[in-house]
Amino acid sequence: MKIENKSDKEEDQMFITFEGIDASGKTSLLAKLKAHVVQKNLQGKCTFTWEPGGRKSPEIQTIRHLILNKESNLSPIAEAFLYSSARRIHLDKVILPNLAKNKVVFCDRFVDSSFAYQAFGRDLGFEKIKLLNELATDKKYPDITFILKISYEESMERRKARQEDEDRLEKEENSFYQKVIKGYDFLASYPEFQKRIFVIDASKNQEEIFESVLKILKDHKTFQTHPIYKDFFS
């Protein structure tokens, strides 16, 4: 498949996403990155958002409730369409406007979650979910994606330690999450995505994970060209 070249305007944009199974450490990592941004006084040049949710858009919150509510009885394909619909709204309302302002957008989950959870976890197939999401997003992909990799057993231990009420997806069984993990492994080796995806050993402590991400960002050729780069690492 031919990969379209970015326009000059898109070359100046930086869209960074974070992926992984539940309790992989994305929330803690993003909190550290946000603190780093505040320390560098770059709040006005960065945006932090998430899926499904995105700055509490009422439309997306309605979809989120449908997807995650334990009382919902959704078919796998209905679930996939709901995620892609929420993603389109999120793009329109949060991601694209902030990228147009040349802000760095840090996002907790994006299309790769649909690939891992719906294409693999729900057995809908990669090509089908890729087609659906490319239609929904106009083939918008992140510039950099970090996949935080942990085992299902480690995920379960962390989730039990949190002692939080689990949503519909978090209640899925081992077999579902093993397929999701295989999905993330597939994405990391998929030729079209290899340049943007970096796998992080999320079994390490939070500081080690944070430092690993900072090093990748510091060495990343595209990030080096962004106006924020010098101040981000000053």
Swiss-Prot record:
The name this protein goes by in its record: Thymidylate kinase
GO CC field: cytosol
A GO molecular function held by the record: dTMP kinase activity
Enzyme class: transferase
Catalytic activity: dTMP + ATP = dTDP + ADP
Disulfide pairings: none
UniProt family annotation: Belongs to the thymidylate kinase family.
Coiled coil: none
UniProt-annotated binding residues for ATP: G20, I21, D22, A23, S24, G25, K26, T27
Function statement: Phosphorylation of dTMP to form dTDP in both de novo and salvage pathways of dTTP synthesis.
Protein EC: 2.7.4.9
Keyword tags: ATP-binding, Kinase, Nucleotide biosynthesis, Nucleotide-binding, Transferase
Gene that encodes the chain: tmk
Superkingdom in the source lineage: Bacteria
GO biological process, one term: dTDP biosynthetic process
